[in-house]
């Protein structure tokens, strides 16, 4: 279902980002020595500015949530048992339903998952499964090239221009009907050591989410789909709330 509200929110946000773009913001971003290739089509000035804004607005709270994980584990290590939070009693005691699902997520009986490697993406989208969960997390080694090329592969897939030719000359390309894409970004505890903002590593979660959302949301909505995310390894409702705010 085409979401006009989300589309106009994106257009406004992107225009605002471009309006606020300045060299001071970009100078906050540095790259680790291992990040030798820049990937200019992915790491545009506008995209980097978007990552900086995400980092400055949300990373502080993320670090607080990670600190809370340590404190919670210490509490359990002392022999205490988990308990339901008092402040969420109304959720447990009342009747409620989740918001309606988008049309292209109504049937998820057959899904496939794998890393964001180019051939894998093509085969997964052509597999006949209803959903492909493109994984930046466990199944993807987070090297600089894997992360950046994974983003480019997804851009090409969403624009339906992705193809791959192996060493024997066999060409892979998309069928007319393909699976719906869900992105699995890295967990909250994982940093991306290759991108630094003000000298500090950025959250891998924000890199995976930010670059994918920035480059693809307009085309996804045009495709009558949307930016869908599988959020791994959440340990508390406050962490889910953090993602909702992002």
List the predicted regions and their residue ranges.
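Internal mixed beta-strand/loop scaffold within catalytic domains of large alpha/beta enzymes
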Residues: 105-112, 119-132, 137, 141
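N-terminal flexible segment immediately upstream of the FAD-binding catalytic core
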Residues: 97-99
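Short, Lys/Arg-enriched N-terminal segments with co-localized hydrophobic residues
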Residues: 1-17
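Hydrophobic or amphipathic alpha-helical targeting/insertion segments
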Residues: 129-167
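Hydrophobic alpha-helical membrane-insertion signals
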Residues: 64-65
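Conserved alpha/beta-domain cores
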Residues: 21-35, 39-46, 50-56, 85-92, ...
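N-terminal, Lys/Arg-enriched amphipathic/low-complexity engagement segments
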Residues: 71-94
């Amino acid at each position: 279902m085409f979401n006009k509200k989300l589309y106009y929110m994106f257009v406004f946000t992107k225009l605002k980002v471009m309006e606020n773009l300045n060299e001071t913001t970009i100078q906050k971003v540095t790259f680790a020595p291992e990040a030798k290739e820049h990937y200019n089509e992915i790491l545009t000035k506008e995209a980097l500015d978007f990552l900086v804004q995400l980092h400055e607005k949300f990373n502080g709270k993320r670090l607080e949530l990670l600190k809370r994980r340590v404190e919670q584990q210490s509490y359990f290590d002392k022999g205490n048992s988990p308990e339901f939070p008092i402040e969420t009693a109304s959720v447990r005691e009342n009747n409620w339903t989740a918001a309606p699902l988008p049309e292209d997520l109504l049937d998820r009986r057959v899904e496939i998952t794998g890393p964001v490697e180019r051939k894998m993406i093509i085969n997964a989208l052509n597999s006949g499964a209803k959903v492909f969960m493109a994984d930046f997390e466990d199944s993807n080694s987070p090297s600089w090239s894997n992360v950046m090329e994974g983003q480019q592969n997804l851009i090409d897939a969403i624009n339906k221009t992705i193809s791959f030719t192996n060493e024997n000359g066999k060409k892979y390309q998309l069928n007319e009907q393909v699976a719906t894409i869900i992105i699995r970004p890295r967990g909250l505890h994982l940093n991306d050591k290759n991108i630094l903002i003000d000298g500090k590593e950025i959250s891998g979660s924000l890199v995976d989410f930010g670059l994918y959302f920035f480059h693809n949301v307009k085309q996804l909505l045009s495709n009558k789909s949307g930016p869908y995310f599988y959020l791994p390894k959440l340990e508390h409702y406050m962490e889910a709330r953090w993602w909702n705010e992002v």
